[in-house]
């Protein structure tokens, strides 16, 4: 087997490389994500959740990812630098995976998002008028600083800071939530990921997972992609979710 190790800082890379070689895995190191990662049997990400999101932005077909958390919360990761060897050995030997949906956005056809698509005002501190449609049905029109269309995985990201609910990672859904809405009592919507979401706004930018962005005026469509993010199975993912959420901040 061949593994790509993608690292933000190289403090633990030597140990990870040696551990993989003991498992008879060929290793190639990358200090930046690359489209080449699609050609490997699996990927080891060394960093935080942001490192994994940057890796995913480069991939359409996604080999299984094993995350070693050197960041803060590490909701997407499997192990820490202190305990990764046991967990990595177990993952490689069992090779059980789990898939989480990513979403596509018509404004950025070459980019897929795992966490969210955010629509923001192009001008800082200036509100925009947003219209929201679900399967062609207008749900609302609202003035706000922006609007987030998040996945269940993204419920603990930007949507969380905007007041959205925490959703368990295996419940596939869209969370629709405005940023700083100019209205009393606005509540998020949670809808099936089989729905088609349309957001209409002017003088806006659209951002995928806090990484890539483009300007747009008019309408964008957000839908579930046929290319999921693939991770090694993490049996503690649900069990650890709420403790990690409590640790945020």
Swiss-Prot record:
The keyword Iron-sulfur does not apply. It catalyses: NAD(+) + ATP = ADP + NADP(+) + H(+). It is found in: Cytoplasm. The active site is at residue 49. InterPro entries: ATP-NAD_kinase_N (IPR017438), ATP-NAD_kinase_PpnK-typ_C (IPR017437), NAD/diacylglycerol_kinase_sf (IPR016064), NADK (IPR002504). Its cofactor is a divalent metal cation. Gene3D superfamilies: Probable inorganic polyphosphate/atp-NAD kinase, domain 1, Probable inorganic polyphosphate/atp-NAD kinase, domain 2. GO terms for biological process: NAD metabolic process; NADP biosynthetic process. Its EC number is 2.7.1.23. Homotetramer. Involved in the regulation of the intracellular balance between NAD(H) and NADP(H), and is a key enzyme in the biosynthesis of NADP. Catalyzes specifically the phosphorylation on 2'-hydroxyl of the adenosine moiety of NAD to yield NADP. Belongs to the NAD kinase family. This is NAD kinase. The lineage of its organism: Archaea, Methanobacteriati, Methanobacteriota, Archaeoglobi, Archaeoglobales.
């Amino acid at each position: 087997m061949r593994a790509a190790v993608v690292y933000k800082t190289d403090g633990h890379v030597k140990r990870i490389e040696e551990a993989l070689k003991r498992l008879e895995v060929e290793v190639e190191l990358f200090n930046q994500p690359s489209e080449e990662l699609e050609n490997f049997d699996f990927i080891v990400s060394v960093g935080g959740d942001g490192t994994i999101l940057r890796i995913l932005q480069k991939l359409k077909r996604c080999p299984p990812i094993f995350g070693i958390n050197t960041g803060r919360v590490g909701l997407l990761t499997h192990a820490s630098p202190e305990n990764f060897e046991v967990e990595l050995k177990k993952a490689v030997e069992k090779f059980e995976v789990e898939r989480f949906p990513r979403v596509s956005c018509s404004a950025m056809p070459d980019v897929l998002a795992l966490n969210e698509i955010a629509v923001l005002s192009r001008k800082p501190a200036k509100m925009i008028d947003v219209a929201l449609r679900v399967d062609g049905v207008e749900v609302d029109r609202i003035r706000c600083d922006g609007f987030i269309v998040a996945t269940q995985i993204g419920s603990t990201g930007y949507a969380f800071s905007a007041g959205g609910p925490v959703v368990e990672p295996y419940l596939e859904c869209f969370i629709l939530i405005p940023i700083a809405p100019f209205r009393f009592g606005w509540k998020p919507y949670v809808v099936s990921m089989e729905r088609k979401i349309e957001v209409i706004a002017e003088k806006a930018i659209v951002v995928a997972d806090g990484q890539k962005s483009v300007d747009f005026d008019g309408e964008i469509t957000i839908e579930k992609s046929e290319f999921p993010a693939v991770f090694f199975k993490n049996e503690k993912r649900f069990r650890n979710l709420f403790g990690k959420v409590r640790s945020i901040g």
